[in-house]
A protein has these predicted regions:
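Conserved mixed alpha/beta catalytic, RNA-binding, or beta-rich assembly cores of soluble enzyme
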Residues: 33-110, 115-127
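C-terminal edge-of-domain segments
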Residues: 160-167
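Short Gly/Ser/Thr- and Asp/Glu-enriched loop/turn motifs at secondary-structure junctions
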Residues: 155-159
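Short, hydrophobic/π-rich interface segment
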Residues: 113-149, 153, 166
Length: 167
């Protein structure tokens, strides 16, 4: 059995369509403008390795020598119980937004925690991916009618990576 992205699942496994939602181009561009203007909370750094600098807009890791902007981002807005701001990266130069909406990005299959939230932006479930199969966790969360969206975060640093929604 295949989903719309062509991923093969065993016949006994249900497939649920989902959409990957990377950081918006508007937010990435605003971060670039703030860094260019010298905002103290928008730091421009140069990647010194191929790991450790994941762009939340194109959903790929920066290569050594690429310039990145490190800035605070709140995936859940202030005033909500689960509101939190944390550091994320985007490329300093414009990059193409990740567009494979029905396909989980290969670069982020390991070391992630998945958090399901309801329509009031309250966390209702969470699970760490063991191995490199996030799809069953995503599908389990999205099968719950109370789940409005899922956030994907780094296990080691807790940083926001992307959002996943039901199609």
């Amino acid at each position: 059995m295949r989903n719309s992205a062509g991923r093969v699942y065993p016949a006994c496994m249900k497939t649920l369509e989902f959409r990957i939602v990377p950081l918006s181009t508007e937010i990435a561009d605003a971060a670039r403008r703030a860094a260019d203007a010298g905002a103290s909370d928008h730091t421009v750094i140069t990647a010194d390795s191929a790991v450790g600098y994941p762009c939340r807009h194109c959903l790929r890791w920066a290569q050594p020598g690429e310039r990145m902007i490190l800035f605070p981002f709140a995936a859940i807005p202030a005033g909500q119980p689960y509101a939190e701001s944390g550091p994320i990266f985007v490329h300093a130069k414009p990059c193409e937004r990740y567009s494979k909406t029905h396909e989980y990005p290969e670069s982020f299959r390991n070391g992630r925690v998945f958090r399901a939230y309801n329509s009031k932006q309250n966390m209702i479930d969470a699970e760490v991916v063991n191995g490199n199969r996030p799809e069953p966790i995503i599908e389990k969360f999205l099968e719950n009618p109370e789940t409005a969206f899922v956030h994907v975060r780094s296990v080691s640093h807790g940083c926001y990576t992307m959002q996943v929604e039901r199609v």
